[in-house]
């Protein structure tokens, strides 16, 4: 049934306040950040001052300030735990507005500050003695671990449970057989690793939070307060708003770009979904489809260059590679993911006979560029500075100041003191929950390191696949990544997964960068993978749709994201700059044919090319799509021939 009437933005504007409230309630259930306490009186003002002090500390000591890595991480932990116990409620239904925190929170605050301050003052002495600690220092470590777990319970919930299982594995693993077993460890040995060393709570996870994550979250907040999100939305409208199913395409572009910057798929759904989902429903899309489009678009931003939600910088750090190298390799998966999603919403619009947004609601492209184009300068600055040799940390800090300067190029976008303060407060608050996740991840990584779990899992999977079966190993890692990443922010999910799953893929024969990228994508896709699928479920709340159906639609729309990692797992030519034996032309041709394969797969799933596709046509399209996703001349010819045959047959039928 055709619906040719254009959609008017004012038709959905009146419901936005109601949807904002619904999104807020969904976030309060799924996302701890939205449940933060609101203090009245002097304490509220003091917290704002402390957030500003924390931001200044991070900006200074991650760039030009001199401080040891262990002290930077420990002080970062102190700030994280302090703000967690001040701002995050003890339980979900706790009253948000208050004058003071409960007495037990002061106990946790004192325990956190005291234990980590003692570590700062005594770390060098303990390190010089080979990690020998007294009974009192065992107690101090226990206090710190308890505080970390309580903070993680409030900020991330499920991750604290997972970390508790890993921590317990240090002891009960001694009673397990085979690859899962180990010799067991004393309490003191575990605490030396988890607190007094650099493999536990003060290890890689918190190191990432104290540098890349904090700076790029704050950078994203400055971009938001400068009006960059409005520019993205307006520019997306000018690009695709008038096309068939325009609102869904606007959602894909705008949500993808914003997700790339803020790194939280769930928060991104709640922010952009209140605008895009009602528009899609008004256009004629099913409510489950509308919610799924928003969830899938927001999720992909976490592995989309140039920012990748800060995950790319973390990956570069782990691999000891240039970020440019990581970003180039990430282009193909992100490109195919969003091409597939755009094609899906286009074919669905054609199948349903949907129109675009009314012409009078589409801003003039030249006016948008003239009035808001200067807001792109911070991103240009970030990319340009890294290209000429600046570290990502320096580039991020400089780009924050560029954001302020660029906003002053036009009166209506100027960031005055209030907007700057708002960006600092919002950015630092947003960094808390992710930071706490990174602290508790240290427990997981510390356990993996101490017990050799990563190596043992690798040996186990290789014994199951029995030989050089990289794809079967990849399938098992995919499941592992999806499980470990469920309900965890993108960066944190990747840090967990890479500790356990990357060694498995490398042992199976994958290149290190490919192994990391493989795990990253599946860790991010856990946001749309049932039964958890947190992004899809938040979107379903806004769309007022069935959660299970929305989650299943999200998997279908994001299917290319689940498939493409297997095609580059043993075929690095698909990733730009990874295969040193391939020419640029070979890489570009492989990407081009992969896009055609994506077209065939989506067309087959949606049942539309030129017109509605029959069952046989759909089967042919789905069957030939893998031939084009795998690099190879013969497979390319066969795949293109299959698609051409279907297109010719459809054209003849249309006549």
Regions found by a protein language model. Give the residues of each.
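Conserved, well-structured core domains of diverse proteins
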Residues: 1-131, 137-145
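Long hydrophobic segments that form regular secondary structure
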Residues: 373-513, 521-522, 602, 611, ...
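Core transmembrane alpha-helical segments of multi-pass membrane transporters/permeases
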Residues: 149-155, 165-166, 170-173, 179, ...
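Membrane-interfacial loop-to-helix junctions in multi-pass transporters
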Residues: 135-139, 200-212, 238-252, 283-289, ...
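Alpha-helical transmembrane segments
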Residues: 73-78, 207-217, 325-340, 391-400, ...
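Long, contiguous bundles of hydrophobic transmembrane helices that form the permeation core
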Residues: 2-45, 328-430, 534-626, 654
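Hydrophobic transmembrane alpha-helices that form the pore/transport pathway of multi-pass ion
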Residues: 233-301, 307, 311-314, 320, ...
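Transmembrane alpha-helix interface/packing and boundary motifs in multi-pass membrane proteins
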Residues: 220-224, 255-264, 296-302, 442-445, ...
């Amino acid at each position: 049934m055709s619906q040719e009437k254009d959609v008017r933005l004012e038709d959905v504007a009146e419901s936005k306040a109601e949807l904002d409230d619904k999104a807020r309630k969904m976030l309060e259930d799924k996302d701890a950040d939205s449940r933060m306490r609101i203090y009245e009186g002097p304490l509220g003002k003091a917290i704002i001052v402390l957030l500003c002090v924390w931001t200044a500390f991070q900006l200074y000591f991650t760039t030009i300030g001199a401080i040891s890595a262990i002290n930077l991480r420990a002080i970062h932990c102190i700030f994280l735990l302090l703000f967690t116990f001040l701002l995050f409620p003890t339980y979900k239904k706790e009253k948000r507005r208050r004058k003071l925190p409960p007495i037990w929170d002061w106990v946790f605050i004192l325990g956190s500050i005291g234990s980590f301050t003692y570590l700062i003052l005594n770390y060098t002495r303990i390190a010089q003695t080979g990690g020998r600690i007294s009974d009192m220092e065992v107690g101090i470590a226990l206090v710190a671990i308890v505080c970390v777990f309580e903070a993680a319970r409030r900020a991330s919930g499920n991750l604290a449970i997972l970390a508790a299982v890993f921590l317990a594995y240090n002891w009960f693993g001694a009673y397990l057989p085979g690859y899962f077993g180990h010799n067991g460890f004393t309490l003191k040995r575990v605490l030396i690793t988890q607190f007094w060393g650099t493999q536990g709570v003060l290890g890689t996870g918190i190191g990432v939070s104290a540098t890349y994550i904090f700076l790029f979250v704050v950078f994203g907040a400055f971009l938001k307060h400068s009006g960059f999100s409005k520019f993205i939305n307006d520019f997306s409208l000018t690009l695709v708003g008038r096309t068939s199913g325009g609102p869904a395409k606007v959602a894909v572009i705008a949500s993808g770009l914003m997700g790339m910057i803020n790194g939280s798929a769930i928060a991104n759904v709640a922010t952009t979904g209140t605008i895009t989902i009602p528009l899609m429903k008004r256009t004629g899309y099913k409510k489950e489809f509308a919610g799924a489009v928003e969830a899938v678009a927001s999720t992909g931003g976490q592995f989309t260059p140039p920012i990748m939600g800060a995950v790319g910088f973390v990956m570069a750090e782990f691999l000891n590679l240039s970020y440019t190298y990581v970003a180039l390799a990430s282009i193909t998966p992100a490109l195919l993911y969003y091409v597939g999603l755009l094609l899906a919403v286009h074919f669905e619009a054609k199948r349903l006979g949907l129109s675009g947004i009314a012409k009078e609601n589409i801003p003039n492209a030249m006016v948008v560029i003239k009035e808001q184009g200067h807001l792109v300068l911070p991103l240009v600055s970030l990319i340009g500075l890294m290209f000429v040799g600046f570290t990502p940390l320096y580039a991020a800090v400089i780009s924050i100041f560029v954001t302020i300067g660029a906003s002053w190029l036009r009166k209506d976008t100027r960031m005055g003191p209030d907007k700057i303060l708002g960006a600092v407060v919002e950015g630092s608050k947003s960094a808390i929950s992710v930071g706490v996740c990174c602290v508790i991840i240290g427990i997981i990584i510390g356990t993996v390191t101490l017990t050799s779990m990563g190596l043992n899992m690798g040996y186990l999977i290789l014994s199951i696949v029995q030989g050089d079966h990289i794809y079967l190993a990849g399938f098992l890692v995919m499941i592992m990544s999806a499980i470990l990443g469920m309900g965890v922010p993108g960066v944190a999910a990747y840090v967990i997964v890479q500790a356990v799953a990357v060694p498995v893929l490398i042992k199976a024969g994958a290149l290190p960068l490919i192994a990391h990228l493989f795990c990253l994508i599946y860790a991010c896709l856990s946001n749309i993978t049932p039964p958890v699928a947190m992004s899809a479920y938040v979107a379903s709340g806004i769309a007022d749709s069935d959660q299970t159906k929305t989650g299943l639609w999200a998997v279908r729309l994001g299917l290319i994201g689940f498939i493409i990692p297997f095609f580059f797992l043993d075929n690095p030519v698909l990733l730009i700059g990874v295969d040193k034996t391939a020419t640029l032309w070979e890489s570009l041709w492989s990407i081009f044919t992969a896009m055609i394969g994506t077209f065939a797969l989506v067309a087959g799933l949606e049942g539309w090319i030129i017109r509605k596709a029959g069952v046989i046509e759909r089967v042919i399209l789905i069957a030939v799509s893998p031939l084009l996703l795998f690099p190879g001349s013969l497979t390319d010819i066969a795949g293109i021939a299959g698609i051409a045959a279907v297109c010719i047959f459809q054209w003849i039928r249309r006549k």
